[in-house]
Swiss-Prot record:
Pathway entry: Nucleotide-sugar biosynthesis; GDP-alpha-D-mannose biosynthesis; GDP-alpha-D-mannose from alpha-D-mannose 1-phosphate (GTP route): step 1/1
Listed InterPro entries: GMPP_N, Man1P_GuaTrfase/Man6P_Isoase, Man6P_isomerase-2_C, ManC/GMP-like_b-helix, Mannose-6P_isomerase_type2, NTP_transferase_dom, Nucleotide-diphossugar_trans, RmlC-like_jellyroll
CDD domains linked to this entry: cupin_PMI_typeII_C (cd02213), GDP-M1P_Guanylyltransferase (cd02509)
Pfam family for this entry, one: MannoseP_isomer
Name the record gives this protein: Mannose-1-phosphate guanylyltransferase
Biological function: Involved in the biosynthesis of the K2 capsular polysaccharide biosynthesis.
GO molecular function, one term: mannose-1-phosphate guanylyltransferase (GTP) activity
GO biological process, one term: lipopolysaccharide biosynthetic process
Top enzyme class: transferase
Gene that encodes it: manC
Organism expressing this protein natively: Klebsiella pneumoniae
Catalytic activity reported: alpha-D-mannose 1-phosphate + GTP + H(+) = GDP-alpha-D-mannose + diphosphate
Amino acid sequence: MLLPVIMAGGTGSRLWPMSRELYPKQFLRLFGQNSMLQETITRLSGLEIHEPMVICNEEHRFLVAEQLRQLNKLSNNIILEPVGRNTAPAIALAALQATRHGDDPLMLVLAADHIINNQPVFHDAIRVAEQYADEGHLVTFGIVPNAPETGYGYIQRGVALTDSAHTPYQVARFVEKPDRERAEAYLASGEYYWNSGMFMFRAKKYLSELAKFRPDILEACQAAVNAADNGSDFISIPHDIFCECPDESVDYAVMEKTADAVVVGLDADWSDVGSWSALWEVSPKDEQGNVLSGDAWVHNSENCYINSDEKLVAAIGVENLVIVSTKDAVLVMNRERSQDVKKAVEFLKQNQRSEYKRHREIYRPWGRCDVVVQTPRFNVNRITVKPGGAFSMQMHHHRAEHWVILAGTGQVTVNGKQFLLTENQSTFIPIGAEHSLENPGRIPLEVLEIQSGSYLGEDDIIRIKDQYGRC
């Protein structure tokens, strides 16, 4: 059986404003009801696999846990990186965790934010890779190129190992992102693949090769795993140890150096959705080449991508535009300038604007909070608490709160007193009062919260007790 190891780190800044640092693209629902992370998991349906292991940023832990819970795939299988150290250490953490009890699984390493539309072809390639990984090779999946792309690294194939629909080859070399002229030459030669960043190998084989070429990375990761906190859902890697680990990609650390690298070609309608232009290319279009998502309308317009999270967007007489509207930001640009989105993100960071980091709607382990109005002296929030969800028992030094129940039933605790509130009822939480809110019902609890006081920062939440381990 295969152990899927899903790399869910990264910030996805090229899909701003939908993708934010605290809610990056791998958690977005761009093509239906499932997020990209969830699609990565469901795409493996039909293969013999263990429960997936997901590696993510510590700040995304509750997002990942909730999305795995929705798939019934949550079982102490989330590794939390306190800092990003690239793919070689991340895979090492997964391999060390997987071999703790003497097992040596075949690891299928996947990115959480890729699209692979031809699932049968993908599964066929996995089965071919499985044979060679089981024999001790380190297999990488090379994407059959259809254009002289300069945004991907390339893999040059060497000697063919067999003759089949997915002929595996020895890896001749890995190549950095080329200029246009070299990319065209690679495409014409037929000897090169795009580097997908997907791999398969035995866990212990990867660790032995890492020990051979980068023992410093292995040593740091081993120390981190030995000191990890294994909770019910999360495997928390300690910051003070892991921050000493070198930052290195698996290509540089292992794949370019090993004598056992094999590449399996994959022609399965793959995309890493690395820009708004790429998303337009892989999305279904109308007769004029427009992609419309959400509340959008066009007239006499061609080849546009329009995505509206909430507001109506109407476009008339335009072409080749990307228009993305969220609750707190709007992006308008020429589709050919998709790579320049990062300049907007850099501007927001430099000017300490929160829009690069978080959406107006913030996700919590208990549900979500939509910041409707935000001022220095008061905030108005629309809060949704999922069934069974609960605030921590907490208090504030500088703010009071008013809660109005819009829908559902809330169990409120204030200074030890517990009572129920239902629709159209309200309560007041004074400054300094210990308080909590829980949803004991079976439907979402909707609450209008008004915060007022001299200071409204998140660091004025003094947690006393918390079922999510945030104290």
